[in-house]
Amino acid sequence: MSELKPIEIKEDAKPRDFEAFQLRLASPDRIKAWSHGEVKKPETINYRTLKPERDGLFCAKIFGPIRDYECLCGKYKKMRYKGIKCEKCGVEVTTSKVRRSRMGHIELVTPVAHIWYVNSLPSRIGTLLGIKMKDLERVLYYEAYIVENPGDAFYDNENSKKVDLYDVLNEEQYVLLEQKFSESGFKARMGGEVIRDLLASLDLVSILDQLKIEIESTNSEAKKKTIVKRLKVVESFLNSGNRPEWMMITNLPVLPPDLRPLVSLDGGKFAVSDVNDLYRRVINRNTRLKRLMELDAPEIIIRNEKRMLQEAVDALFDNGRRANAVKGANKRPLKSLSEIIKGKQGRFRQNLLGKRVDFSGRSVIVVGPKLRMDQCGLPKKMALELFKPHLLARLEEKGYATTVKQAKKMIEDKTNEVWECLEEVVADHPVMLNRAPTLHKMSIQAFHPVLIEGKAIQLHPLVCSAFNADFDGDQMAVHVPLSQEAIAECKILMLSSMNILLPASGKAVTVPSQDMVLGIYYLSLEKNEAVGANKIFASVDEVMIAVEAHYLDLHAKIKTMVEGRTVFTTAGRLIIKSILPNLKENSVPESMWNKVMKKKDIANLVDYVYKNGGLEVTAGFLDKLKNLGFRYATKAGISISIADIIIPESKYSYVDEAKKRVREIQNQYGSGLLTDSERYNKIVDIWTDTNNKVAAEMMKLIKTDKSGFNSIYMMADSGARGSAAQIRQLAGMRGLMAKPDGSIIETPITSNFREGLNVLEYFISTHGARKGLADTALKTANAGYLTRKLIDVAQNVKVTMDDCGTHEGVEITEITENGELIESLEERVLGRVLSDDVIDPITNEILFTEGTLIDEVKARTITDAGIKSVSIRTPITCKASKGVCSKCYGINLGEGKLVKPGEAVGIISAQSIGEPGTQLTLRTFHIGGTASTEQQDRQVVAQKEGFIRYYNLKTYENNNKFIVTNRRNAAILLVEPKIKAPFDGEINIEVAHEDINVIIKGKSDEVKYVLRKHDLAKPNELAGVSGKVEGKFYIPYIKGDKVKENESIVEVIKEGWNVPNRIPFASEVKVADGDPVTQDILSGANGVLKFYILKGDYLERIKNVKKGDMVSEKGLFVVIADDDDREAVRHYIPRNSVIKFNDSDIVSAKDTIAKPQDGSKLVIAEWDPYSTPVIAEEAGTVAYEDIEPGYSVAEQYDEATGESRLVINEYLPSGVKPTIVISTKSGKLIRYQLEPKTAIFVKDGAEVSRADTIAKTPKAVAKSKDITGGLPRVSELFEARRPKNTAIIAEIDGTIKFDKPLRSKERIIIMAEDGSSAEYLIDKSRQIQVRDGEFVHAGEKLTDGLVSSHDVLRILGEKALHYYLISEIQQVYRSQGVAISDKHIEIIVSQMLRQVKIVDSGHTNFIVGDMVSRRKFREENDRIMKIGGEPAIAEPVLLGVTRAAIGSDSVISAASFQETTKVLTEASIAAKFDYLEDLKENVILGRMIPVGTGLYQDKKVKIKINED
């Protein structure tokens, strides 16, 4: 390798572009070839002449001249001597910037280990040689010997313990063995030289073969792990062409001097880079060692010097990694080469990813209400500086100045010509504004500058929310785009009038807020006794004249002609109507403007205009809206006065009554009727209830005050500022406050801010206020860090193709919580592509085929058809090899169109999730710590009509009450019939491939009905383990059941309440199986009533239904037909309903068609919200076990009844398990283990009957929710951390069986129907949530705790994980009112799943247990299968975002994220290639990024120009 010459790339010969970047180990020869000379002296510069010393660290001969084209001694100056070497000083005459790239080297006297390969786990040198890191260090630091050749040496005299190669010996062992066996070839040495020789002598190929044999033969897992570690290192050396001995340094490279500068400060001092100090120590020690060796010094001294040299080199590469860090003059550790590149201040993040740029400036912002949407006000002073070069050119071009110098003078003097030219330059040159923190793409937008006087930038009020800016002193930065392409992109893509929709949710972001909302709201209000009320006007113009002449109030109700129709409206609303744009197709419907316009309504209006009119129309409309809002907010003269804050009279009586009720509860507690937690819960409930009552009264008062024109009410109601919760604090009562730990203080603040707080109340308030401020400060950092991790994991996701061709998808339904709709199916399916046909449940025809993109109209059609679940394509199921495809992503929410290839969807997703994170954290203190607890649920109520079906539900009867005895796997369903049996017969159910056939066999006939398999509710959905049941089919019979004619055999589930999520154990059921549930049925459409009866699976028309009839048969439907005789709506009329119209009557949408006959059964079940009862399953006699007063239970005396009750202590001695045992007549023993704080309701030896309550356990105390749970919860989910108390989850469906405990752990066995079983050992401290003999589904929790996402993936698969993660993450954001589209979370989740774990390596190069990216896995398997080999098998793994980002395929991207040294160590040994496919690595290398318009770089682009 001696022919390697010094390389220097001349400026013009630099490669303009390169395909890939590879990191390798440098061989000693390569280092020498890079070098321009050896650095022999530790000197830097001469302190008198300030010239660099020769052969020193800054030597000009080695590194190049200090001044351009000038040698050191001054013999050659000027450009004409370029390339000449001065004979006197040896310096080449060239530019001084070669000092940034020329390297030197130091020849070390002894080989030294590179600390990264010794100390970075796993230690690469140690792994290769198969010795421990500690031992390796002892050898390198001259504390121990390593055996180089064992010869025939033995440790003992019997010659049984052989000395092996690479054994590490201490001094005594070495001396002994050396004396005995030196003749027989024994040899051992210490230090870097021996390690280098051993590495050089390794035969990697034979080691590889040997390891592969070992791994096959060993059974121990631990051994396998170590072998695999070693295999990986050996393989990477073999594949990369690196040699192991290169990990030892013989030639130490010296960094170019301009990268470790030495700057002189005033006062004769110097600022020196730490690296120079570290190099000086290496050179000093190296020279001393050389001298000592020449002098033949004693071994011990030389050894010591060698050790010091090793330490000096260690400190240079990574100071403080091993021993104590080397400190400088000022007692702080010196910054080594590793520290220079890593961390926030390191090379990557400080200088490569975040550079300061020219042509930028910053200033304070003020509001610019007169600007257009796409304009910003730029101070002349700033513009002058920013556009200086443009200005100089323009002045010369126009002939005002002849030289640059003259032009500069003109600019300094600010002559009139300068201003004239500046106007011209700025006229068509957009600028970009940025507000830090730049959390999403809307934080940088382009504007056309308008030159203004003053020093502050003016910002359009509507773009404030996108920037999250306000005018309380915020600053913004201005950047000037320079190239033509950049200017074009600013105008086409980044102009603020183009960024109207938020990429996170597709909602408009430039919506009027605050004053503007207030103005428009005021304009749209109605007033009863106003001037000119109830008049009729001929046209809109006439109305305007009347208003201007003061003959008509803005708020008066009037009648006028609008677009050829008579409309009841007000003058104010007509003014709003006058600014609405003329849309080509569908003009804005009257219902959108002829009403009180609150913030939501204005947002909907903007959305509508955008969807139907496009960008330009919307931008113009928004400006008009802004002007209108400001104008009328000013005219309205709304202000706050103390008189607006009205305190209801009834407040004081409510508070007194509450105090009385609290006293009663305290007395009950004092007499032992209640447990402490029950007392606490009840008190908190009373005050919450009182607060709500007072608030309701107060809102009623304020709402009616000044007939709706109360200033405070207007502000809150319009959505301009404030909320009901805040008005409640002003005029109602402040309510309950929370402590910093989230628990509620039971003493409420009964005063409000108008009355003022007393000292105690003020003190209680400080808790919340202080917590708010502290949280804000802490969480902003967390949210920023989360964003950074998300960006890093998703930065390589871009749209790479139109369609990946997959048929897979994920089923989605509407999201409800406790029966309340959270997000409708319509919203969720909007902008997605179907992965399966959508079939109309009523007509069974295909509405939309697979591959259809769902827009607003189609989404509406889907919900109108009553479809409850749709299967859509998602990024998680996308099969594109890199990134995602357009179809799986759906629409780009920022544009509202299908996403185009090249869009950086990963970055958009990460920003969309990260950006609200900071808002979440900032949102805690707005409620000022006021506790928010809802009152507990006590019952479930039916919202729909139909009849009841029990699914697996078992009940006990006790005193004519029916008590639920199931703890799981049961439900009460509300259904309507879908298919009725046409005759008596036997039912048979067959499962075909995708279908289910329901067959009824009668005496002579047979009929078959075909259903789609996935339309049927699955058992785990019915049990509430996963998914939704609404809209699915239910078959209440099993194979072989007999059915009667007209009995319903297939039903549609309308509502489902499962046990235990919706109906707790031991609830009282109020409806029997088969009971009808009736409601008032509203028509819902205008049209003709037609009655039908269900026969088999079709509807048969019946005409004999009359008003007043009572329905007695299952299967009566009413259809309302519209003018074209098409079905508009269909309703099921249950039994016990009274019909209110005759057949073929005409009805309107608000008519009630049918009513319940009596006060219908609406309550399905009810229960005690505060405690969970323990119920006797059978009658028998009670016996106590481990229940001893004063030991495991305490006695609580009840004065009112004179009885005492036993309550289990909160903390029990270990091994004590208070239990009630019931022995039945048949001699069976039933055991009930009681939890702490349980109150016992039966005496020892008492007789109990079935379903009696024997004890009650209080439910846990409610803590008020705060986003503190939010942000940590989100990062916990994205990091895929296992929660502290992970729930143990059933892995298979089956029946629970308790086995005898093992080592004080409970043993649970699940027996599946096919005979397989799974066993779980559960710690005694955990609460077990299953009972013996119960049936559980895979994925159900067996113990308390949070579900770990890893378990979900392992047991239920990727789609279940998708459902779980998205619903958990969305829950946090929704609780804060933040809308984020699911697809963003899906992109991140798909990145967390981008690696797989090899289970079986087949014929591939993978090793079992390896984690590889899916892409590598697919490529390798394709390669093996092409040559006819066995492919590898892998299982999906879930990685947290940090792990996933560090495991990125790109070296540069991973290194710039975290754990830089580790990433670089691994990459250099494996000689990894980085193909520069993604964003981050290209930013770092300063290339065009390969997304968006960057995709078309170097391609020819045709541009079409629209003539119009």
UniProtKB/Swiss-Prot annotation:
Entry superkingdom: Bacteria
Keyword line: DNA-directed RNA polymerase, Magnesium, Metal-binding, Nucleotidyltransferase, Transcription, Transferase, Zinc
Matching SMART domains: RPOLA_N
Cofactor binding note of this UniProt entry: Binds 1 Mg(2+) ion per subunit.
Cofactor dependency: Mg(2+); Zn(2+)
Positions contributing to Zn(2+) 1 binding: C71, C73, C86, C89
GO biological process: DNA-templated transcription
GO CC annotations, alphabetized: DNA-directed RNA polymerase complex
InterPro entries: DNA-dir_RpoC_beta_prime (IPR045867), DNA-dir_RpoC_beta_prime_bact (IPR012754), RNA_pol_asu (IPR000722), RNA_pol_N (IPR006592), RNA_pol_Rpb1_1 (IPR007080), RNA_pol_Rpb1_3 (IPR007066), RNA_pol_Rpb1_3_sf (IPR042102), RNA_pol_Rpb1_4 (IPR007083)
Class of this enzyme: transferase
Pfam (any one): RNA_pol_Rpb1_5
Record-listed E.C. numbers: 2.7.7.6
Residues annotated for Zn(2+) 2 binding in this entry: C804, C878, C885, C888
Catalyzed reactions: RNA(n) + a ribonucleoside 5'-triphosphate = RNA(n+1) + diphosphate
Binding site for Mg(2+): D470, D472, D474
UniProt record similarity statement: Belongs to the RNA polymerase beta' chain family.
Subunit structure as annotated in this protein's UniProt entry: The RNAP catalytic core consists of 2 alpha, 1 beta, 1 beta' and 1 omega subunit. When a sigma factor is associated with the core the holoenzyme is formed, which can initiate transcription.
Protein role: DNA-dependent RNA polymerase catalyzes the transcription of DNA into RNA using the four ribonucleoside triphosphates as substrates.
HAMAP family named in the record: RNApol_bact_RpoC (MF_01322)
Name of the featured protein: DNA-directed RNA polymerase subunit beta'
Organism of derivation: Campylobacter fetus subsp. fetus (strain 82-40)
